[in-house]
From Swiss-Prot:
Domain EF-hand positions: 8-43, 44-79, 81-116, 117-149
Annotated residues for binding of Ca(2+) 1: D21, D23, D25, C27, E32
Note: This protein has four functional calcium-binding sites.
Protein name: Calmodulin-2
Alphabetical list of CDD domains matching this protein: EFh
Molecular function in Gene Ontology: calcium ion binding; enzyme regulator activity
Alphabetical list of SMART domains matching this protein: EFh (SM00054)
Binding, Ca(2+) 3: D94, D96, N98, E105
Organism domain of life: Eukaryota
Pfam families per UniProt: EF-hand_7 (PF13499)
Record gene name: CAM-2
Organism (species): Glycine max (Soybean)
UniProt similarity note: Belongs to the calmodulin family.
Cystine pairings recorded for this chain: none
Length: 149
């Protein structure tokens, strides 16, 4: 499954993995998964976190290592009912729920994920996605960016 990913995708997932893997030991624990999900405004129970880990924990050691994480991401990318997931992700970014992601909202979420971005980097991300040039990202633009990944 993971062998269908491009080098770019793998590099991107490695970066995402290291955001989860707070102590850098090469494994994501339920605690680390919970921390990241809470920073994204989710509030999973301990049981839900354990279920998520069990779903991809191929070797049964109770944590997710990078190959297991890659398999999860490859499966999620094949998941065609991702419309709901995209809407959910958009809502996480669109803090004031006005239908647009502003530079401030983007910076806020990225900071919560542990990504310290300069104003220039945030503006660049907005510019890349901002098809109609209004300085913010609407849902259609968001979907385009997410599907291009």
């Amino acid at each position: 499954m993971a062998d269908q990913l491009t080098d770019d995708q793998i590099a991107e997932f490695k970066e995402a993995f290291s955001l989860f893997d707070k102590d850098g030991d090469g494994c994501i624990t339920t605690k680390e998964l919970g921390t990241v999900m809470r920073s994204l405004g989710q509030n999973p129970t301990e049981a839900e976190l354990q279920d998520m880990i069990n779903e991809v924990d191929a070797d049964g050691n109770g944590t997710i290592d990078f190959p297991e994480f890659l398999n999860l991401m490859a499966r999620k990318m094949k998941d065609t009912d991702s419309e709901e997931e995209l809407k959910e992700a958009f809502r996480v970014f669109d803090k004031d729920q006005n239908g647009f992601i502003s530079a401030a909202e983007l910076r806020h979420v990225m900071t919560n994920l542990g990504e310290k971005l300069t104003d220039e980097e945030v503006d660049e991300m907005i510019r890349e996605a901002d098809v109609d040039g209004d300085g913010q990202i609407n849902y259609e633009e968001f979907v385009k960016v997410m599907m291009a990944k």
